Structure formats: C-alpha cells, structure tokens
Amino acid sequence: MGLKRFKPVTPGRRFMVISDFSDITKTEPEKSLLAPLKKTGGRNHHGRVTVRHRGGGHKRRYRIIDFKRYDKAGIPAKVLAIEYDPNRSARIALLLYADGEKRYILAPKGVNVGDTLMSGPDAEIRPGNALPLEKIPVGTLVHNVEFTPGKGGQIARAAGTYCQIMAKEGNYALLRMPSGELRKVHIKCYATVGVVGNEDHKNEVHGKAGRVRWLGRRPHVRGVAMNPVDHPHGGGEGRGKGHHPTSPWGLPTKGYKTRRGKRPSDKFIVRRRNEA
C-alpha cells in the first residue's frame, strides 16, 4: 500500500494525502458476511447525545469479522482477497477454510492473496497465524489480543498497531500495549502474530472538511466560541476562559486524570502508560 498526493488544483486538494488502495484486491464484499448497520448520530437508546460530533456520513454495511479464530484450530485457510472496510482503519482479509467456510479477519502486514493461514496451539509462528500466548515466543509482535480467554481479540486492532510479548511469569504473559502500558494477560488468551496492516493510515490527510463529514464526523465547536449557557468557557469579553480549562460538564481537562480509582483490573497493570 502507498500514499497518493495531489496537485493543488483546488484548496481541498492542496494538502490531501490519501491511500492509493493498491493493496485492495476485491472491491465488492462477501454478501454472506455482511450485516445492516444503523446510524445512531451519537445517541443512546434514550435519544440523548452520548458522543458529540457524530452524525451523517456515507451509508455502511457491517463486515462480520472473526476476532476469535480458536474454533478453527488446525484447519488451514487460504487468503482469497484483501478488502477495504469502512468501519475500521485496518484492511480485512477474506479467508476460505478447508471445510468450505469463509470468514473475514484483520489483514496483517505481509499477508497476501494466496497465503495459507492457521490457528490453534500447533500453528507456525508467522504473520497471520493465531495462537495462545503461551505458545508464542517472548519478543514477538502480536495483534488482536484477547483480555479474557475465549472472548475474542480486543487490543491492537487498529491499522499499524501491535503489542509486544515482554516476558512470561506463571499463568500470565507480560505485554507492552500500543500505549506503552505494561500489562499482564493470561497465557490462554489468543493473539495473532504480526502487525496490523495499512500502516500508512496515520499519514493520511483529509484535506477538506467535506471528506471528514463523509466519515460521519460533525464539526467540533470550541467552548470559548459558545455562550455561557452552553459551556463553562462561554461568554465574556474577548476570548478568555476566565479559569482553568474544563470539559463541557465542568471537569478539569488538560492533564486531569479521569480513570476510576480502584478497578479489579488494576492488579494486572505493571506500569501505567504515562510512566513508560
């Protein structure tokens, strides 16, 4: 995959940098692996906004991704295609298993059409294969990591992300997360070897506001541009906040820790990300 730059024939093209989609081998998704996706506009079941700046965007259909893979242990799968997924930054790979079933997985870096992938404790250590952490050597880069055995991958699923296995102690493996946090994860949890593909996603530049709207993101209005009724920063003469920066609900921002004090998972965190 590469990046595509444009001549500044219009203001919107001047700084635009997008993917050239050269890694995509199939343009139409697999119908049996699609599901309808209803837009929420950032609202919950009460109709209240729970995530601001969401709404609109191009219509999408959800691609059903296999984040588990352990139920296909020992069954080889051939990579049929690398596809675009509008619901995530990573590409997805269409697999055809030897038993005839087709499934989508996150497309790892270095996996191409025609490759054969495996999952299970006896799988080879190579990009795209899924194994329990106890079977993966220390130092290996992995993605799509489970937090709870059997739940499916939850960590390192975005384009270009990975975790690194730093050590193994008893029933736990010590993983360095994409954030830099060191965390213990049970060795029975599955992970996929390698790095998530489409690494250049972080270098893309939308170039114009309209392209961001196509993605379903609405304008982010500054608090100082609002009225006092709408935001703690609102009102006043000029652009001053008048006090320490806060969120729209009055909580301090810019460095204020919002993580709940005592959580059951605290005992698995060896080093916080801000201490890395």
From Swiss-Prot:
Biased composition (Basic and acidic residues): 230-240, 263-276
Region (Disordered): 223-276
Signal peptide: none
GO molecular function: rRNA binding; structural constituent of ribosome; transferase activity
Top-level taxon: Bacteria
Alphabetical list of SUPFAM superfamilies matching this protein: Nucleic acid-binding proteins, Translation proteins SH3-like domain
GO BP of this protein: cytoplasmic translation
Pfam family membership, one: Ribosomal_L2
GO cellular component, one term: large ribosomal subunit
SMART domains: Ribosomal_L2, Ribosomal_L2_C
Alphabetical UniProt keywords: Ribonucleoprotein, Ribosomal protein, RNA-binding, rRNA-binding
PANTHER family cross-referenced by the UniProt entry: LARGE RIBOSOMAL SUBUNIT PROTEIN UL2M, RIBOSOMAL PROTEIN L2
Record-stated family: Belongs to the universal ribosomal protein uL2 family.
Subunit structure of this chain's protein: Part of the 50S ribosomal subunit. Forms a bridge to the 30S subunit in the 70S ribosome.
Function of the protein: One of the primary rRNA binding proteins. Required for association of the 30S and 50S subunits to form the 70S ribosome, for tRNA binding and peptide bond formation. It has been suggested to have peptidyltransferase activity; this is somewhat controversial. Makes several contacts with the 16S rRNA in the 70S ribosome.
Protein known as: Large ribosomal subunit protein uL2
Organism: Thermotoga petrophila (strain ATCC BAA-488 / DSM 13995 / JCM 10881 / RKU-1)
